[in-house]
């Protein structure tokens, strides 16, 4: 049960593909999606680098729908003391903790073949890959996306009008 093997070879990849192929996103909107490589390098709980170097040491083929790698969660914290995976400082001023949701990351544990990092109520935890959790969907879009209004903030999110 390797979480990552020869690309994002797992149930999570299958889920992303099924979301993309479904009618959740209309084809007119999918035209603005930009496929990107995903960083899926494994990391140990003791590694403190949050630059993306560890996770980006291995990448998938480009995909249109994905989720975040662990380093992206760590870097979202505005607390300068967020330097270790298990540090409570990483939950401070972190956009991803606004709803205290539970969700998977793309990052697997380097020391096992079956554990994956997930965010659980604002904390980083290691969980067996056969457990259930939510996905925080990430879609990259090109700069030509027709914005109706908004500034991208939590209070005034972008409103997209892809029918223009």
Segments the model singles out, each with a brief description of its role:
Residues 1-164:
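Collagenous Gly-X-Y triple-helix signature in extracellular proteins
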């Amino acid at each position: 049960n390797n979480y990552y093997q020869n690309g994002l070879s797992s149930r999570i990849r299958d889920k992303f593909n099924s979301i993309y192929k479904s009618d959740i996103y209309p084809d007119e909107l999918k035209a603005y999606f930009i496929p990107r490589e995903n960083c899926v390098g494994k990391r140990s709980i003791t590694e403190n680098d949050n630059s993306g170097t560890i996770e980006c040491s291995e990448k998938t083929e480009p995909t249109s729908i994905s989720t975040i790698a662990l380093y992206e969660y760590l870097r979202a914290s505005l607390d300068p003391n967020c330097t270790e995976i298990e540090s409570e400082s990483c939950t401070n001023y972190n956009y991803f903790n606004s709803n205290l949701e539970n969700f998977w990351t793309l990052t697997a544990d380097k020391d096992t073949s079956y554990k994956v990092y997930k965010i659980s109520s604002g904390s980083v935890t290691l969980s067996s890959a056969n457990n259930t959790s939510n996905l925080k969907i990430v879609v990259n879009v090109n700069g030509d996306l027709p914005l109706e209004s908004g500034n991208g903030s939590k209070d005034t999110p972008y409103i997209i009008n892809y029918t223009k």
